[in-house]
């Protein structure tokens, strides 16, 4: 089983991602974090293989705060893959920063919020 932790600002979006992953491959065991403050512990407890986090311009979901969580998770679980989700239409500058984080090797992948559930699942499957 591949364990995936999903930490999204929008609970409906988190549910959609979890459902898409489960429907794509029954090998995915998906856990949803209730809040960013609980994400690191959830990743450690579940021994997550992949952490998917939404990045927005709002507190607790800002890129800087997400990178802190990334650092905490990687310190305890270096093999955990980090994937950031960003809305490239409403957050153009933030989307550029997320893309640069990937280029700089700080994250394993990023996904734009406008992609299909099937594509998201396929990308996660390749990690």
Enumerate the language-model features and the residues they cover.
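Short, aromatic/basic amphipathic alpha-helical patches
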Residues: 17-21, 68-72, 93-103
């Amino acid at each position: 089983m591949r364990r995936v932790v999903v930490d999204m600002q929008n609970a409906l979006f988190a549910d959609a991602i979890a459902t898409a992953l489960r429907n794509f491959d029954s090998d995915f065991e998906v856990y949803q974090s209730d809040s960013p403050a609980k994400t690191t512990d959830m990743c450690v407890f579940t021994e997550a293989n992949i952490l998917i986090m939404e990045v927005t311009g709002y507190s607790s979901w800002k890129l800087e705060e997400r990178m802190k969580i990334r650092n905490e998770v990687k310190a305890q679980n270096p093999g955990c893959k980090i994937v950031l989700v960003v809305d490239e239409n409403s957050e153009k500058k933030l989307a550029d920063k997320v893309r640069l984080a990937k280029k700089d090797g700080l994250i394993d992948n990023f996904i734009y919020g406008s992609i299909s559930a099937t594509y998201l699942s396929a990308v996660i499957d390749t990690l």
